[in-house]
Amino acid sequence: MTLKVIDVSAHNGTILWKNVKGRVDAAILRAGYRGYGSAGTLAEDKRFRANAANANALNIPIGAYWLSQALNEREAEEEVAYLVKLLKPFRIAYPVYLDSEYCEQNANGRGDRISKVQRTKNALTFLKAVAAAGYTAGLYCAENWFTAEIDGEAIRKAGYTIWCARLAGKPRIGDHDAWQYTWKARVSGIPGDVDMSEFYRDFARGGADAATKPTTGARKSLDTIAAEVLAGKWGNGADRKKQLAAAGYDYAAVQKKVNALIRR
């Protein structure tokens, strides 16, 4: 299964979403960012609310990403608290990603020169908080960043979905659920170039492809279901609750187990 997914921000200008509909399978929207200056001010993407509202109105599945410049775990938690408030009014079917990359051309952003160990701690804190808020959490980064600047393998082993950018060909990082392969796609309704990715899991339909989608045949343990929830295989929010109930699982018990796993 391969899905066409764009990612957009205020830099893409005013988007005519009615023209976009039917040309892509989903969109990942920049919700906001922490400024890369010393103040580190939290900010909302100027087009996020309009993009999210218009995509929701047309039933175009959306996810979100947040560009982090957190210096420590406390700031990572602060970023998620701000982010979740932005997301709450909207239907978020696709993952909520931590965008980990240099934020200033010469790597002089406030968070650009923290250690790999600290950046990984920040990322794990961020993603745990996103998952605790009921969203599928994931990491976005470039292929070289996955090993050089962050411990991508530790994040993958923790059960978070991976979205990797590589313009020269498919990422060589092992398992990943999405590949951003160009920054210069063209889609009707979007002025100029737009980022395009291939996604290999349909998060809008429970977060798994046909080979891995949860089934209702065999009864699974609470630990197994909770792990699948963290891996994004049961969707988000109300959709997750509906799917778990339809499969005969106690949503409250599963969510309690998920929260316990996150706190480990």
Say what each PLM segment does:
Residues 214-234, 264:
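Disulfide-bonded cysteine-rich modules in secreted/extracellular proteins
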